[in-house]
Every structure is written in C-alpha cells, then in structure tokens.
Amino acid sequence: MALLEDIPAIRVLMQLSINGLLKPYLTERQLEASIESMGLDEQLIKDQTYFIVNKDNIFVGCGGWSNRKTLFGANHTPNRDDSFLNPEADAARIRAMYTHPDWARMGIGTLIMNVGEKEAKKAGFTKCELMATQAGVSLYKNHGYIAKEEINYESASGASVSMTRMEKHLK
C-alpha cells in the first residue's frame, strides 16, 4: 500500500516509466504532453487503493484502482471528478500503472493489475475500466481487456496523445 510519504519516489518512478517506455511511441512534444495527462492522483493514496512494488528499496512498479469517476490523470489534470462510482452500474477504474523500464515485462504490471481487480471485486464491482497508453494496450489485451474507444488527449500545449479506453468484466 502506498503512503503519502512515498510520493517523491513514486513521481521519480513515473517519470522514468514515461520517458523510458513511451519514448518509442511518442514524439518529444507528445512525451511532454503526456506528463499533463498522466501522473499521480494523490486521492488514490488517500483512499488506500494505490500500491507499490519495492525491490531492494527501489520502487519498480506502482498502480491501483479507484471507486471514483476520474478515469485517468494526475492532481493537475483538467476535468477530474472525485465523486464516487456505483458498483452496481459503473466500472471500477484501474489507475496510474507505471513500471520501471529496467523491470518492464517481468510481471510487475500484471501483479499490480491483479491486486487492483481483486480489490475492486471485493468492493462489489463486476467490471473494470482503464485508459491505456499505446505502450500498455498489449498488456491489457493479454489480460482480457477489450478496447472500447480511441481518444486523442489534447494537451494545453496543443500536442495530441493517443489513448485507448479499455474494459474488462471481472470473473
């Protein structure tokens, strides 16, 4: 479980992940814009729904789930909605998944996603939804998520970043 005191280390991990794993998919301008659409939503930590994977005192992964309406973004992202979802009608959100580039494709993201889905199910949700970066789509597809909508996030600087809204029914 992530704690508020972990925030500085989480931010470093997020920056490493964005710069290391998204670089093959995005231009430099899009990478800069990604920082606006991604990052840490501290509400997840306050809600105790955000997790970290720590290996030898190094954060190698983080992510979580949410029962709030905001689908993606950080504290600074426009159009946030911290109102609660209805588990009987809405999908829980899988949020802010980041892996250290040196630990990519070693099961860290899968571990965090599985914990988030399990916790969402315990909270009464029957499905999960997330907003995937181009780098994450294949991971989520491999775990049963289905692409529902392609969006282009337009940053304040005018750069457009392609993302995919995905959904999964929990078993």
What do these predicted regions represent?
Residues M1-V12:
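A short beta-loop-alpha structural element at the N-terminal edge
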Residues T49-I52:
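Hydrophobic beta-strand residues of extracellular immunoglobulin-like
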Residues Q15-L40:
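Conserved GNAT-fold acetyl-CoA-binding loop/helix
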Residues N54, C62-A104, E119, Y153-S162:
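Conserved acyl-donor/pantetheine-binding loop and adjacent beta-alpha core of acyl/acetyltransferases
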